Structure formats: structure tokens, C-alpha cells
UniProtKB/Swiss-Prot annotation:
Species annotation: Rattus norvegicus
Region (Disordered): 1-53
Any one GO biological process: transcription by RNA polymerase III
Acidic residues: bias regions: 1-34
Protein name in UniProt: DNA-directed RNA polymerases I, II, and III subunit RPABC2
Keyword RNA-binding assigned: no
The gene coding this protein: Polr2f
Location in the cell: Nucleus; Nucleus, Nucleolus
Amino acid sequence: MSDNEDNFDGDDFDDVEEDEGLDDLENAEEEGQENVEILPSGERPQANQKRITTPYMTKYERARVLGTRALQIAMCAPVMVELEGETDPLLIAMKELKARKIPIIIRRYLPDGSYEDWGVDELIISD
């Protein structure tokens, strides 16, 4: 037994004060997030008479769609494109996005509390 292992019975953690700065960090992360929600394509989108948001997919929406779809593929969701030896879920998700076959609806919230639903196939994707 070494000199450093004398009194480690797990009670030492009770003496540590909680850091109050963590709450500020969590709030800052929440404020920085874009007002976007990812919906499964089974849910019917809201019928929009006139859309006011941009028809371009933002880099944040692209990242979230690719991450969500890659997670679904990793959990054995059916793949919507033909595979040519790809095994990486992220590469498969990128291939699906390029083919506009991702079954996800993006919900964009507006400042007045309303929202617009956009299918991935409706958005203009810049590479």
C-alpha cells in the first residue's frame, strides 16, 4: 500500500462545493442553439400557405440532419439508397442527403411562436 491510498473511503466528495458557473455555461449553450426541430417524416407537416424562411438548408440543419440520420442508420434503420460497399453510417447519411432521400422533416420556429415545416427534399442544399 502506498502513502497516497490511506483514507479513500468515498466520503471526500461531500466536501466539494458545487460550481455555480456551470449554470451560466448551460444557459449560454441553450441560447446559441438554432430554433430548429427534427421530425420523423411520418408526422404530417403543417400546411403552409406562404413560407417566409429561406429555402436553403443551413449548415446547422445539415449537421443535425446528418447526425440524426447517421444515428438512425447505426441503429439498423432501413437505408434509402443503394449501398456500394459503404459501412460508415455518416457516409451513408451523406449519400442519402445528396440523393434527397432522407425521411426527415425540419421544423423551423419563428419568433411569433408559429413554425414552418420543410422536408429535406424541398430544401436547397449547398455543398
